[in-house]
Amino acid sequence: METSLRLRGGGSRPQSKSQEGLRIHAKEKLPIASNALLQAHGEIHAATGAPTYLALLFRNFYPRLSANLGLGLAIHFRNNQPLPLAWDNFSYTLRASKAIIPFPSNALLGINLKGRLLADKYFNPTARTAAVELAWTILDLKRGQDVRLKLGYQLLHKMPYFQLRENNWTFNAYMDGKWDVRFDL
């Protein structure tokens, strides 16, 4: 099981305010075929102990295309919402990504295309995201230290973002003032 501590801040919208603060996130990947797995996520707010997120996602990988596709269910708990009401507000998730390596001589520099669609229980779309990222991985920057830099652009929100990952630490910053930090335990 993969476990991480996540801290988010800087949001100005009410729904982002409810997701700020320290959260404990757990993820389990269960292989079900050679190129497929079932991925379960769960998250609780560290201060209240209340669940903030639960998800179950079927992911299929296409190695020859450097792509993957995921389909699943997610529940976001907001403002200590009682459990039966939260289950009434679950959403469907469809996500896809494709990696492009423009310089075959340097496989550590690449372009990622990502898309995600969320739909309510009646299959009405509620949120869409699409992004393009330039990703650069630097192995052994210092002994035992791997670094990954990502510069991305959210196409639908017309907003750039940045990610810096160093071994167990990840820092994300968005041009609208939001940020988050993750530490993988």
Curated annotation (Swiss-Prot):
Transmembrane segments: 30-39, 64-73, 89-98, 106-115, 129-138, 146-155, 161-170, 177-185
Chloroplast intermembrane-side segments: 40-63, 99-105, 139-145, 171-176
Name by which UniProt lists this protein: Outer envelope pore protein 21, chloroplastic
Cytoplasmic topology ranges: 1-29, 74-88, 116-128, 156-160
One annotated GO molecular function: porin activity
Similarity remark: Belongs to the plastid outer envelope porin OEP21 (TC 1.B.29) family.
Organism: Oryza sativa subsp. japonica (Rice)
General function of this protein: Voltage-dependent rectifying anion channel that facilitates the translocation between chloroplast and cytoplasm of phosphorylated carbohydrates such as triosephosphate, 3-phosphoglycerate and inorganic phosphate (Pi) depending of ATP to triosephosphate ratio in the plastidial intermembrane space; in high triosephosphate/ATP conditions (e.g. photosynthesis), export of triosphosphate from chloroplast (outward rectifying channels), but in high ATP/triosephosphate conditions (e.g. dark phase), import of phosphosolutes (inward rectifying channels).
A GO biological process held by the record: regulation of monoatomic anion transport
Recorded name of the encoding gene: OEP21
Major subcellular location class: plastid
Subcellular localization(s) per the UniProt record: Plastid, Etioplast membrane; Plastid, Chloroplast outer membrane
Any one GO CC term of the record: etioplast membrane
Mode of membrane association: Multi-pass membrane protein
Keyword annotations of the record: Chloroplast, Ion transport, Membrane, Plastid, Plastid outer membrane, Porin, Transmembrane, Transmembrane beta strand, Transport
Keyword Membrane: yes
UniProt region (Disordered), positions on chain: 1-22
InterPro entries, sorted: OEP21
